[in-house]
């Protein structure tokens, strides 16, 4: 998801997105630990998405 799309969402939607991404990251980590993860780039994408959501949340908190 692009940063511009994230900025249009409200705080509740961003928090829900963050919880969703953290759950997805947990699942991917478990798959990587057990050797079932085929597409390892997904870990990086999810980690980056989490950082983007947290950044937008912090920006909105400062407003």
Swiss-Prot record:
PROSITE patterns: RIBOSOMAL_L29. Belongs to the universal ribosomal protein uL29 family. GO terms for biological process: translation. The keyword Iron-sulfur does not apply. This is Large ribosomal subunit protein uL29. The gene is rpmC. GO terms for molecular function: structural constituent of ribosome. Keywords: Ribonucleoprotein, Ribosomal protein. GO terms for cellular component: cytosolic large ribosomal subunit. It comes from Haemophilus ducreyi (strain 35000HP / ATCC 700724).
């Amino acid at each position: 998801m692009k940063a511009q799309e994230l900025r249009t969402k409200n705080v509740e939607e961003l928090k829900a997105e963050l919880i969703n991404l953290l759950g997805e990251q947990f699942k991917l980590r478990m798959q990587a630990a057990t050797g079932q993860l085929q597409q390892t780039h997904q870990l990086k994408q999810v980690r980056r998405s989490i950082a983007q959501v947290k950044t937008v949340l912090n920006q909105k908190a400062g407003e």
